[in-house]
Amino acid sequence: MQTLHDTSFASFEEKKSTFLAYLCPIKEFDMLHQQLKTEHPKAAHIVWAKRCLNEYRQIVENNSDDGEPKGTSGPPVLNVMRGFELVDVGILIVRYFGGIKLGTGGLVRAYGSSAKEVIAQANIIPFVFKETVRFSTLY
């Protein structure tokens, strides 16, 4: 499994639509999502996917198409994250519509390519399980 420390960014263009992709640690995900909504009020969509480990070391996944046709944006991004075995991270992709419809296949390819591009730009590191342990001794 892999993760990252810092947020990374990449942009991708497909048939005049612009895709702005952000990969961030899960701790920053909600704050970044709100920030992007504020910074990009005219964006057509803000699609996201995230993967994290729960307290039982199970991978919990979620995604949103944010108004794109069902299954054409969030799931492809999530599948890319699975392929790279990323955990405790989220990807947000802001889309500005360029006037040319991409179709369902085009959307799947564009969102998947955006996710791959932002991962390629990121400083990916191995994921290490960490636990806090307290102990005391007499001396």
Regions found by a protein language model. Give the residues of each.
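C-terminal regulatory domains involved in ligand/effector binding and gene-expression control
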Residues: 1-71
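Charged, amphipathic alpha-helical segments and their flanking helix caps
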Residues: 5-8, 105, 113
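Short flexible coil/turn linkers enriched for glycine and charged/polar residues
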Residues: 17, 43, 85-87, 129
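Structural motif
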Residues: 22, 46-48, 88-92, 132-134
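Ordered, amphipathic secondary-structure segments that act as subunit-interaction surfaces
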Residues: 68-104
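Stable alpha-helical structural segments in soluble proteins, enriched in small hydrophobic residues
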Residues: 110, 114-122
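Short glycine-/aliphatic-rich beta-strand segments at the starts of folded cytosolic domains
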Residues: 125-139
